[in-house]
């Protein structure tokens, strides 16, 4: 089993990590749908990585996500994978510095994860090798006052992924897997992340082993 011939959607694809993942998946033979909220950045990504399918959507809007799902199904059919890269960081200032404004910006990534995973749930369950992956943070295991808002959102996202994993395990074929990657920072790890995503469809990457897993990504020694 490989990712070749699989159809994978990257949510929040216009970042450096999104571009790296898109390129690695295309090079490995996957069909890739890249989703972004900025038309200019999305157009640049489509031009930079030939072969990807670009889709503009606000992933924090439930109706927009449902419309996205209909367009994706019409253009490329059902998905085999979702890579959720919607994110960002705000923090500092201790507990008193954890502003409501910052939290509302950060929670958009969790909102997007919930909408996208629900919209493509049936695709992933029905696929012979459904995969959904997120990038979380090592701060979930060691929270700090200055990153309380950020870490709370990441912890909620990890909890959602464990719930998806339980749902996948109960499905008739149990062929899908929900995977969490943790990083201290994505800067400099774009290639490592891309390789890890492609490896989700390796022959030895069976769903039972992957499902519910949490793996820290680090730079090669």
What is each of the regions a protein language model found here?
Residues 14-15:
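Conserved glycine-rich cofactor-binding loop
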Residues 60-75:
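Conserved Rossmann-fold cofactor-binding substructure of NAD(P)-dependent oxidoreductases
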Residues 28-44:
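Conserved glycine-rich Rossmann-like NAD(P)H-binding loop of the short-chain dehydrogenase/reductase
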Residues 88, 94-114, 125-170, 182-187:
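Catalytic loop of short-chain dehydrogenase/reductase
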């Amino acid at each position: 089993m490989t990712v070749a011939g699989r159809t994978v959607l990257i949510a929040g694809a216009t970042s450096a990590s999104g571009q790296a993942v898109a390129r690695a998946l295309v090079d490995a033979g996957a069909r890739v749908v890249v989703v972004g909220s900025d038309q200019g950045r999305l157009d640049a990504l489509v031009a930079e990585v030939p072969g990807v399918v670009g889709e503009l959507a606000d992933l924090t809007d439930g109706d927009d996500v449902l419309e996205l799902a209909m367009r994706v199904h019409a253009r490329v059919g059902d998905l085999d994978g979702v890579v959720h890269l919607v994110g960002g960081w705000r923090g500092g200032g201790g507990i008193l510095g954890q502003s409501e404004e910052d939290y509302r910006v950060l929670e958009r990534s969790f909102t997007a994860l919930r909408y996208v995973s629900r919209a493509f749930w049936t695709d992933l369950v029905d696929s012979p090798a459904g995969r959904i992956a997120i990038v979380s943070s090592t701060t979930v295991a060691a929270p700090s006052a200055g990153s309380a808002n950020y870490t709370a959102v990441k912890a909620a996202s990890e909890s959602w992924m464990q719930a998806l994993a339980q749902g996948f395990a109960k499905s008739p074929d149990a062929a899908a897997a929900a995977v969490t990657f943790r990083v201290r920072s994505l800067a400099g790890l774009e290639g490592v992340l891309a390789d890890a995503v492609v490896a989700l469809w390796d022959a030895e990457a069976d769903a039972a082993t992957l499902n519910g897993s949490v793996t820290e990504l680090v730079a090669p020694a």
